[in-house]
């Protein structure tokens, strides 16, 4: 489906033709009857949403109807496809690269594990194009933290690609690439509940990575999001939830759904699988962006808390597996060695210097 390239106006606009109106009404009626809609119908619906073509009441009803019934992977994939089609362009690399990202919304207020993991993974030789936004549940989201480090959030797509080439890591700020999200924001704020938009962020990286490690805020989402990644054509990915966190956990078992060349395997991981000690969730508590900056600066220079290093090592270990390094214990040890060397912090400094 060809999505309009016209910039959305500040006011709600009606679909352009009578046929569009009938089709959209049919889609909405199916949702009101608690029926699933197809990937194509979902793509049409979310295309209309990000162009500002739905009334607030229609948008609210559609989102709540999907939430109460439970979103189907095809519906989530259709929504992601619409958002990616509307995204600002990014020069996609032809080499293997990944995203490591969480939905947020887990309410744990932990340190920025996935952001730290991106820099450590790059220092392990991987290429990471991290998609992120401001905080959802914690006091400091990935964008908040990077700003505290002096890293430029509105770096151009070309400059971000150059950073990915040179440093092995770049950060793509969601609002810079997904302008249509703003049409849904007032309704989302009024609803004050999670909707499909809460899980779309990790699925709409404008760089379109073939690999991804995605954390979700609920164990019930692990398998459906893996199914969605399959529909979207990811080569290899892992969806995780660990003990209330949208990360690989070291304080509790982690539920994993791993996609590998079209096949999905579900399994459980504990700290023992990585050869790591266990630590309590309270040991991973974060704070303000400035406090988290200081915590991660110490960690990435090799001077941080053991619990923080272990948490990052576990996530990097699973990310390394997605690139074909299958031994999680060896991967975790490699990550710890990189953390203790201070190499990862040099990448933070180098990325900040490009601002």
Curated annotation (Swiss-Prot):
Keywords: Amino-acid biosynthesis, Aromatic amino acid biosynthesis, Glycosyltransferase, Magnesium, Metal-binding, Transferase, Tryptophan biosynthesis. Mg(2+) 2 binds at residues 246-247. InterPro entries: Anthranilate_Pribosyl_Tfrase, Glycosyl_Trfase_fam3, Glycosyl_Trfase_fam3_N_dom, Glycosyl_Trfase_fam3_N_dom_sf, Nuc_phospho_transferase. Binds 2 magnesium ions per monomer. One of its GO terms (cellular component) is cytosol. GO terms for molecular function: anthranilate phosphoribosyltransferase activity; magnesium ion binding. Anthranilate 1 binds at residues 102, 133. GO terms for biological process: L-tryptophan biosynthetic process. Anthranilate 2 binds at residue 188. Its cofactor is Mg(2+). SUPFAM superfamilies: Nucleoside phosphorylase/phosphoribosyltransferase catalytic domain, Nucleoside phosphorylase/phosphoribosyltransferase N-terminal domain. It catalyses: N-(5-phospho-beta-D-ribosyl)anthranilate + diphosphate = 5-phospho-alpha-D-ribose 1-diphosphate + anthranilate. 5-phospho-alpha-D-ribose 1-diphosphate binds at residues 102, 105-106, 110, 112-115, 130-138, 142. Pathway: Amino-acid biosynthesis; L-tryptophan biosynthesis; L-tryptophan from chorismate: step 2/5. Mg(2+) 1 binds at residues 114, 247. It is an enzyme of class 2 (transferase). It comes from the Bacteria. PANTHER family: ANTHRANILATE PHOSPHORIBOSYLTRANSFERASE (PTHR43285:SF2). Catalyzes the transfer of the phosphoribosyl group of 5-phosphorylribose-1-pyrophosphate (PRPP) to anthranilate to yield N-(5'-phosphoribosyl)-anthranilate (PRA). Homodimer. Belongs to the anthranilate phosphoribosyltransferase family. This is Anthranilate phosphoribosyltransferase. It comes from Pectobacterium carotovorum subsp. carotovorum (strain PC1). The gene is trpD.
């Amino acid at each position: 489906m060809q999505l309009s390239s016209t910039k959305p106006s500040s006011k709600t606009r009606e679909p352009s033709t009578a046929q569009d109106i009938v089709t959209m009404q049919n889609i909405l009626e199916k949702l009101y009857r608690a029926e699933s809609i197809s990937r194509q119908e979902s793509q049409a619906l979310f295309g209309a949403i990000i162009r500002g073509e739905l009334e607030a009441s229609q948008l609210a009803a559609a989102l709540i109807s999907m939430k109460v019934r439970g979103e189907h992977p095809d519906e989530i994939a259709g929504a992601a496809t619409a958002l990616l089609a509307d995204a600002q362009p990014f020069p996609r690399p032809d080499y293997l690269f990944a995203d490591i990202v969480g939905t947020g919304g887990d309410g744990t207020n932990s340190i920025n594990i996935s952001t730290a993991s991106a820099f450590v993974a790059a220092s392990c030789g991987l290429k990471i194009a991290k998609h992120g936004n401001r905080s959802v549940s914690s006091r400091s989201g990935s964008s908040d933290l990077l700003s505290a480090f002096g890293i430029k959030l509105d770096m151009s797509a070309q400059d971000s690609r150059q950073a990915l080439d040179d440093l092995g890591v770049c950060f793509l700020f969601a609002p810079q690439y997904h302008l249509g999200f703003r049409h849904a924001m007032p309704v989302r704020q009024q609803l004050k509940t999670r909707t499909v938009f809460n899980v779309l962020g990790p699925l709409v990286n404008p760089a379109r990575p073939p690999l991804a490690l995605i954390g979700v805020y609920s164990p019930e989402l692990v398998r459906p999001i893996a199914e969605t990644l399959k529909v979207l054509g990811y080569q290899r990915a892992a969806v995780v939830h660990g003990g209330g966190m949208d990360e690989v956990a070291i304080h509790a078992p982690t539920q994993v759904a791993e996609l590998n060349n079209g096949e999905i395997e579900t399994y459980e991981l504990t700290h023992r699988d990585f050869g790591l000690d266990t630590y309590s969730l309270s040991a991973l508590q974060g704070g303000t962006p400035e406090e988290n900056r200081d915590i991660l600066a110490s960690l990435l220079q090799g001077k941080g808390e053991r619990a923080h290093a272990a948490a990052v090592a576990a996530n990097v270990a699973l990310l390394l597996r997605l690139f074909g390094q299958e031994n999680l214990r060896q991967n975790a040890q490699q990550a710890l060695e990189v953390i203790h060397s201070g190499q990862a912090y040099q990448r933070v400094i180098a990325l900040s210097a490009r601002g």
